[in-house]
Amino acid sequence: MIAYKFLRSGRTGTFSEFQWPEPGVWVQSSGDVAACRSGIHACRTTDLPWWLADELWEIELADEVRADEHKLVAPAGRLLARVDGWTPQCGREYAEACALRARDQTGEALVRAGHAGAARELAGCSTLDELLDASRKLAAEIPDAQISLTILGDGALQALAVASSATAYIAAHAAIRLNGPAAYRAERVWQSRWLCERLGLRADR
């Protein structure tokens, strides 16, 4: 089965710190396969937003592949090729796109709460710096929307730091605050589609 795997720089496991060999070399799990504990972990395209890191690789999984929440796990796997399109610049663009999505969701929440003027002020923000400044200012001015606006500001701040995973997480939680769990899932789907389209990945993996 072909899937994807995020690694830190130098083909290093994000959590395990395992040093992956050159592409094409098989790695076998030393114990029983158990999600988040042992085995070769990878993800489908729908799982990508949960696992962002420095490098994205195409990986082949062998033997029995188990699907778990937001991940795949198998007894064996080998890296095939790095996805060159996932670069720091791509990460910045993704983080900015997520932050602007959070802007729109927060603006909708403000309109519902009777703060249409504040929503228009947010809608006029076209850069992350503008969004950060506006969200902080409005959070101080509108006590009943302080939490949502603080979350929005945190998302803009994380995007400025190119913390794309954190920005995506914040955007998804802005969605759940607005419209519940279904909106959270929809936001994660949007994030996955953005990555697939930008990186040229097949959405069925």
What does each model-found stretch correspond to?
Residues 1-205:
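Short, glycine-biased loop/turn motifs at secondary-structure junctions and
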